């Protein structure tokens, strides 16, 4: 018997009583105490299918037997409390992880493969080579990532690709300084320097949590008055999260969206109410009785913030600025009209106002961040490179040989603009 048989996820003490005896009705003789034992545990995750065996949800039982009698014998079963603050647990794991010392983030299984995003899962010091996106793959120059040779539909494709200048080799040259453009947790990613052909930085173990940072390299040019600290030549996303977000099989998505960080992640490890059924057997007579108990689930609450990317761009929207429409008026102010690829890479505010949407989707489509008119001039220079045609959509920014757009079925070639970490790519629209 039990006063109740349904318990909340955090109610771990489950009291019940057993009364076990036998008597001959009408004999006038006193009832006989019958010793008893719990002879079987069964559990169910759905209330329909039952599995025999003591389940993990039962942490302890005060006693599995008794002497019997007409007086009830009290027992207590203890349930496990499997409610987790997964966000706190993940952050603790990041803090407890062994600190890295000069780890090269581009080395994968003994071979170098570069990317625009590197995952960090512990405090310490790190480095990565100053290379355009995935321009090095498995230790060799990945030319197809920035100078594709088999484009289908070349009138709607850009080739070669551009950084601050035309990309002709994997290595970025001319960089004189490196800095954190922004970080979701202030001062978490710091000590950013250039050392030879590498960018070096540190992650503060005492502040580590799920976060994102953008590291950029610059030169000493002050091409535009607003950017006296130098032009950005390229930038990289440092994603601080658990290693298991990329622990997937070939052909599967990452376990979390790119750059995701939790603001809340808590609940029980089980999402349906779970049940345990006890079978009590009298030792002498073999008679049985059952009792069923339920432990309720706590719904999983999982919330967070992720990165948003405009089609073809390697960098996410700046998280502090809302998305907005760019001007379709007569102004030639690039910060109002939005920027083409070459200039968005060069500007130190490449994460901010240049990330805008076109206000005339019927003629341009809001994906056309590179669509410009020949009259768009700034500082005497057009906002496009020699290979960019005005008012054109470029389909191959993430899919190197795809100048066709929807329906292209050729081999996917990841580009230097792809924001994904090594081993992953932006999926093609099915």
Stretches found by the model and what they are:
Residues 209-221:
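A short beta-strand micro-motif common to beta-rich folds, especially ectodomain repeats
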Residues 221-235:
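Short, exposed coil/turn segments at beta-strand boundaries within extracellular/luminal domains
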Residues 235-246:
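Short beta-strand edge segments in extracellular beta-sheet folds
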Residues 252-260, 300-325, 329-334, 338-341, ...:
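Conserved hydrophobic ligand-interaction patch in extracellular adhesion modules
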Residues 214-216, 237-239, 252-254, 425:
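Residues within well-ordered beta-strands of beta-sheet-rich folds
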């Amino acid at each position: 018997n039990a006063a109740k048989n349904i318990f909340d996820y955090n109610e771990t003490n489950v009291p019940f009583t057993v009364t076990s005896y036998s008597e001959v009705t009408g004999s006038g003789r006193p009832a006989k105490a019958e010793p008893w034992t719990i002879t079987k545990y069964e559990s169910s995750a759905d209330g329909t299918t039952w599995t025999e065996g003591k389940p993990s949800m039962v942490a302890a039982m005060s006693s599995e037997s008794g002497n019997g009698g007409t007086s009830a014998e009290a027992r207590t079963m203890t349930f496990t409390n499997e409610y987790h603050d997964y966000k706190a647990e993940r952050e603790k794991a990041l803090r407890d992880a062994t600190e890295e010392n000069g780890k090269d983030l581009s080395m994968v299984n003994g071979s170098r493969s570069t990317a625009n995003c590197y995952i960090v899962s512990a405090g310490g010091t790190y480095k990565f080579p100053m290379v355009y996106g995935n321009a090095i793959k498995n230790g060799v120059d990945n030319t197809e990532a920035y100078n594709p040779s088999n484009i289908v539909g070349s009138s709607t494709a850009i080739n070669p690709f551009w950084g601050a200048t035309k990309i002709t080799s994997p290595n970025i040259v001319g960089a004189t300084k490196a800095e954190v453009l922004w970080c979701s947790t202030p001062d978490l990613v710091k000590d950013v320097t250039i050392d030879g052909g590498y960018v070096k930085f540190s992650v503060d173990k005492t502040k580590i949590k799920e976060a994102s940072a953008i590291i950029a390299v610059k030169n000493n040019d002050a091409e535009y008055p607003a950017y006296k600290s130098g032009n950005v030549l390229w930038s990289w996303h440092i994603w601080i999260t658990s290693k298991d977000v990329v622990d997937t099989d070939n052909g599967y998505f990452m376990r979390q969206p790119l750059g995701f960080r939790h603001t809340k992640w808590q609940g029980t490890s089980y999402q349906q109410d779970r049940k345990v059924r006890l079978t009590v057997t009298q030792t002498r007579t073999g008679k049985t009785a059952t009792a069923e108990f339920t432990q309720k689930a706590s719904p999983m609450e999982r919330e967070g913030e992720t990165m948003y990317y405009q089609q073809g761009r390697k960098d996410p929207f700046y998280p502090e600025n809302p998305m907005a429409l760019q001007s379709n008026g007569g102004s030639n102010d690039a910060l109002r009209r939005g920027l083409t690829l070459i200039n968005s890479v060069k500007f130190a505010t490449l994460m901010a106002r240049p990330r805008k949407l076109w206000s005339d989707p019927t003629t341009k489509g809001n994906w056309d961040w590179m669509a410009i008119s020949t009259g768009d001039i700034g500082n005497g220079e057009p906002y496009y490179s020699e290979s960019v045609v005005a008012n054109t959509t470029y389909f191959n920014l993430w899919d190197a040989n795809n100048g066709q757009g929807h329906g292209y079925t050729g081999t996917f070639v990841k580009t230097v603009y792809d924001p994904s970490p090594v081993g992953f790519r932006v999926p093609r629209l099915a």
